[in-house]
Amino acid sequence: KEKNAVIAKNEQLRADLLRAISHDLRTPLCSISGNADMLLSNSERLDEATKHQIYTDIYDDSEWLIGVVENLLSITRLNDGRLKFKFTDQLLDEVIAESLRHISRKHDDYKIVTDCEELVLARMDVRLIMQVLVNLVDNAIKYTPPGSVICIRGTKTDGKAQISVEDNGPGIPEEMKTHIFEMFYTGKTTVADSHRSLGLGLALCHSIIEAHEGTLVLTDHDPHGCNFTFTLPLSEVTLNE
């Protein structure tokens, strides 16, 4: 029975994955194709501002697809037990700074601030933790209006390294909170860009943090907004301050 349950779960995962890919990846691919066709057939009749916007749209759609592929690869390898972890000791402030260099250019419309304690050394697979941070910040960008403030904090709390991504957006409805870390869950939202999600990012983040023997939780940010907080084990190496 246990073996049959695993097979059924894998079949359901495969079906959900195919459905999500066929439906949600079609939109950016059609956008790229349509914009490229416009440039090829009407380039001489388009002014520079219009061309620049088309180039920007193609770039943004391509970057989104790259992010989706990276998430797909990671989550399938994680589920199959094929994802190899390479744990090293890393400074939180350096990991946060490097992660911000990988955030979508759309963050220019947002105020992203960092507040990190110095010399907090954590044990992590740095590539995967950067993927977690990129996903959490992208999620904050997706569900908050331009001009919002997103704050990334790094601290040492209760014998663990802790990173939080806070936003001052509208927050997440109560009915979504219990499902927010489920794979393929995108919720019912009126956000214009909500179709641009396979519901993989937060599920992947949760799995990666669990593999680090940490926790990832969602809380409300006062007075409004969301606060995603995750913990990592502190390094056993001591830094001389």
What are the residue ranges of the model-derived segments?
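Conserved catalytic submotifs in the C-terminal HATPase_c
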Residues: 86-91, 111-121
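Short helix-loop "hinge" at the ATP-lid/N-box region of the Bergerat-fold HATPase_c
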Residues: 140-141
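Short conserved segment of the HATPase_c
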Residues: 172-184
